[in-house]
Amino acid sequence: MSTERLADEATIFAFVQRFYQIARADDELGPLFEAAITDWDRHMAIFANFWATALLGAKKYEGTGYAPHIGLPIEEHHFTRWLAALDCAGKDVLPPELAERSMARARHMAMSFKTGLLPFKRADGTWSRTPE
């Protein structure tokens, strides 16, 4: 089925709103987002444009989301929580096919971001910003 029939940009925006509702209520993610984001309307529009591009092919987002995350105090466990919040939001709002696609994209993003932000593997198998 074509993505146009699966969802529209309003559905994608509802997905983004639901994600941030979940993430901002999370004990670990909430403080990170609150400290980093000063203009929520602008940020949610950017994130919605990203997902509309990724899931619908809307061509509303260009560039990479990596750079703004470089200075944030993100640790390995945050990725698990971020993925869980996205998964929940997708299941709540998106048609199943798009929810699955969003999670495939999110897992790829998490792996890429983790590789860049946490390049050092500790003896216990976890990843870190700095060598031991």
Where are the regions a protein language model picked out?
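Core of compact, soluble alpha-helical bundle domains
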Residues: 1-132
